[in-house]
């Protein structure tokens, strides 16, 4: 079993925070285990919660269009979220919920070792880049711990 498959199983069994009580399905990352690019969002939405896969709803359709427009195949990237379970009513995840999932996202990044991490949204940006201002760095490549974030 690949290490990322093991992480996915741990995500599905996780009970580190109260989101395990309200989720339909936990949503582990999915994609190419040797990806040069990782996309990291905030948390699963309604469709993701139903299907147990990241970015299959409206945001996923938009991401698919962007990938297609840039000539990137979705099968060549890895897609995940900071928080692996849907917060009720799609609210912003709490710090406790983010911290409960930190090991998962850190392990995913460590194992894949991508060339660039595309950070989507304030929650992902704040978690991965220690709360640095997203507006100040929007559209720029930021380096941290030898990794490139966009």
Task: Name the predicted role of every residue range.
Residues 1-150:
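A polyanion-binding, active-site-adjacent surface
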């Amino acid at each position: 079993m690949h290490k990322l498959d093991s992480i996915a199983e741990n995500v599905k069994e996780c009970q580190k925070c109260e989101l395990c009580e309200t989720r339909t399905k936990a949503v582990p990352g999915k994609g190419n285990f040797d990806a040069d690019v990782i996309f990291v969002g905030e948390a699963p939405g309604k469709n993701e919660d139903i299907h147990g896969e990241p970015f299959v709803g409206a945001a996923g359709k938009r991401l698919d269009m962007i990938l297609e427009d840039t000539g990137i195949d979705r099968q060549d990237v890895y897609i995940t979220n900071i928080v692996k379970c849907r917060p009720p009513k799609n609210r912003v995840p709490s710090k406790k919920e983010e911290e409960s999932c930190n090991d998962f996202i850190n392990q995913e990044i460590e194992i894949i070792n991508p060339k660039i991490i595309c950070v989507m949204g304030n929650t992902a940006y704040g978690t991965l880049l220690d709360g640095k201002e997203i507006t100040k760095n929007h559209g720029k490549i930021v380096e941290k711990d030898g990794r490139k974030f966009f």
